[in-house]
Design a protein with these regions (language model features):
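Conserved short secondary-structure elements within globular domains
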Residues: 138-150
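Extracellular/virion structural assembly segments
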Residues: 1-16, 64-135
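Polar/acidic, low-complexity leader/linker segments enriched in S/T/G and N/D
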Residues: 1-52
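Short acidic, glycine-rich loop/turn motifs
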Residues: 25-35, 122-130, 165
């Protein structure tokens, strides 16, 4: 019968902690967005590692189905939340990125995807900042710049900016 010592012996490194991570957003090559990459990394308050799904194909055989793996559907959206500081650095950069893809005023923008897409990184860290695992979200760009909720009832909180992002795997 397993006991607590067996469990502790099998929980390598004490387990990966949800609050030990780093997000790095590299600006796209074709749009000047004015993002301080190092500062933006410090302002991240939450992120996710999206799920991975395989499709399933039902193959009928004499009144029953057997199931085999199918194609991988498009990946889920990757979402990251930032503290919004008083110079709105991250928000301004994301607005410039969006406007570079499709300008509000004249409905133009960069055409080549490599000019507005970039690689984004999430690193799971150990408690001493050793990188345990790195996830790379390739050809990413912001789908939405989420609303920033404002309220006079919130006396002791910061505003946050959430950024849902499309990517390739």
């Amino acid at each position: 019968m397993a006991n607590i010592d067996d469990f502790k012996a099998n929980l390598i490194g004490g387990g990966a902690r949800a609050n030990q991570f780093r997000v790095t957003i590299t600006p796209p090559s074709g749009i000047a967005i004015g993002l301080d990459v190092r500062r933006a990394s410090f302002l991240v308050t939450a992120s996710i590692l999206p799920a991975s799904t395989l499709g399933e194909i039902a193959v009928p055989f004499r009144g029953r189905n057997i199931y085999v793996s199918g194609d991988r559907p498009a990946p889920d959206v990757w979402s990251t939340t930032f503290y919004n500081d008083t110079d709105f650095m991250v928000r301004n950069a994301m607005e410039l990125w969006h406007n570079g893809i499709n300008d509000f005023a004249n409905n133009t923008g960069v055409i080549n995807p490599s000019d507005y897409q970039t690689d984004l990184f999430v690193e799971q860290l150990d408690r001493d900042d050793t990188i345990l695992k790195t996830y790379i979200f390739r050809a990413a760009y912001p789908l939405t710049i989420a609303a920033i909720d404002l309220s006079t009832a919130e006396a002791v909180s910061y505003t946050h900016l959430t950024l849902p992002t499309s990517f390739l795997v």
